[in-house]
Amino acid sequence: VGDGSPRVDVAVLLRTFGAWIVPLIFTAPLFTQDIYSYLAQGAIVADGMDPYAAGPVELLGHEHPLARSVPFIWAESPSPYGPVALGISSVIAQLTGSSIFWGVVCHRMLSLLGVAAAAWAIVALARRCGVSPAAAVWLGVLNPLVVLHLIGGIHNEAIMMGFLPVSYTHL
């Protein structure tokens, strides 16, 4: 294909991405335990406490299931997260209570939503800038950092990854 057209179109890449992430939807968080801190911080905010005043163990108590699941390094630390991340975690805590399983599922779905929004925006921005949408999706979405870290590891950055390029499409 020497005419400059992409060898693979965006739809094929997005189906590939879907095939890669389906197994991750059903796994425990990969490579990190940050999600457990997100859950505890969300419960703190949902309970009307100040997450910047103390750590999850002090605010929720040693016996709270979400406080017990926070990695030792963060158990006594005040929240490092900003108000948007805490607000999202608070809504999830209100929906899921102390259920670690359902909290993880909800956060992972939000990670997927953030990455899906980024994929849509990356295609739109690539077209606007005269760049191959397939190449942009390949570099921006179908890479190990996004697949394993943001979706597998369930990180707040996945939501930001969606907000940022979507906002650029409105400029």
Q: What spans do the regions from the language model cover?
A:
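Hydrophobic core of alpha-helical transmembrane segments in multi-pass integral membrane proteins
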Residues: V1-G2
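Transmembrane alpha-helix boundary and packing residues in multipass membrane permease domains
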Residues: L86, S90, W120-A124, P165
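Conserved small/polar residues in nucleotide/adenosyl-binding loops
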Residues: T169-H170
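Intramembrane catalytic core of multi-pass membrane enzymes that act on lipidic substrates
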Residues: D9-R108, L112
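Hydrophobic, membrane-inserted alpha-helices
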Residues: W20-I21, N143-P144, L164
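Transmembrane-helix signature of polytopic, membrane-embedded enzymes
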Residues: R7-V12, I122-N143
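Aromatic- and kink-enriched transmembrane "portal" helix at the membrane-lumen/periplasm boundary
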Residues: I100-V104, R108, V115, W138-M161
